[in-house]
């Protein structure tokens, strides 16, 4: 039987880049979407309709799937979306993990974020953590990603699931159809309407295609956790 990879969040910047990466590599890909959009026209992928906040819709979507790439999430940091952010980023991730267990998915690749890491003292190099907590994090997005990340890791440590967690930085590059926050910032900077300066530290940008290749490699070669 041909192996199937499923992507949640395929309409997002990283999700679409990952879809292109997997399809161009010859994989059979299924995408979980809430509604059809023209950007998928001409791409050889199977579309299933559902929502990560609806656990029942995931069982049908995950049936026969070998690898799930979970990228669906709310990144909006504006006020008024806190409840949606919690429902999608935390509850949605819990639903995905449990659906992977029920459907015997071989591996989950979860897209967390560098924002799940707490701020560090000056001149201290960031490294991997063995535990993620919302404590000392600013903003709903960062807190929800930390909580969801720890939920995935807890299930790995308990032997409930085989999963790899990745932490992308600020992605730039093609396929940013919905114009991400980072994409909009870069566009404004190029136009000269958004002067950028850093009083300390640095900001990490990464090509979205490199992130997609990294997630693909994580599915095939990554160590669980």
Q: Which role fits each region the language model picked out?
A:
Residues 186-196, 202-225:
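Alpha-helical substrate-binding/gating segment
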Residues 137-164:
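Active-site Tyr-X1-5-Lys
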Residues 138-139, 169-178, 197-209:
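Glycine-rich "substrate-gating" loop/helix at the edge of Rossmann-like oxidoreductase active sites
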Residues 4-25:
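N-terminal Rossmann NAD(P)H-binding glycine-rich loop of SDR-like oxidoreductase domains
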Residues 77, 114-124, 171-175, 180:
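Conserved catalytic-site region of short-chain dehydrogenase/reductase
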Residues 159-161, 173-184, 217-225:
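Glycine/proline-rich active-site loop of Rossmann-fold NAD(P)-dependent oxidoreductases
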Residues 91-141:
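Conserved Rossmann-fold NAD(P)-dependent oxidoreductase catalytic core, especially the SDR/UDP-sugar
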């Amino acid at each position: 039987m041909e192996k199937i990879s499923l992507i949640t969040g395929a309409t997002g910047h990283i999700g679409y880049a990952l879809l292109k990466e997997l399809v161009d590599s010859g994989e059979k890909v299924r995408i979980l979407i809430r509604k059809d959009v023209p950007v998928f026209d001409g791409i050889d992928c199977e579309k299933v309709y559902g929502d990560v906040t609806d656990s029942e819709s995931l069982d049908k979507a995950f049936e026969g799937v070998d690898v799930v790439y979970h990228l669906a999430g709310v990144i909006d940091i504006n006020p008024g979306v806190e409840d949606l952010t919690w429902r999608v980023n935390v509850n949605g991730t819990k639903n995905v993990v449990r659906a992977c267990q029920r459907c015997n998915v071989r591996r989950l690749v979860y897209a967390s974020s560098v924002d799940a890491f707490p701020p560090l003292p000056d001149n201290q190099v960031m490294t991997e953590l063995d535990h993620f907590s919302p404590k000392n994090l600013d903003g709903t997005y960062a807190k929800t990603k930390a909580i969801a990340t720890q939920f995935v890791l807890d299930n790995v440590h308990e032997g409930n699931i085989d999963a790899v967690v990745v932490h992308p930085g600020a992605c730039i590059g093609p396929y940013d159809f919905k114009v991400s926050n980072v994409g909009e910032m870069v566009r404004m900077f190029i136009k000269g309407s958004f002067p950028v300066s850093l009083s300390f530290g640095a900001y990490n940008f990464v090509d979205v295609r490199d992130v997609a290749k990294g997630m693909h490699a994580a599915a095939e070669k990554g160590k669980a956790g």
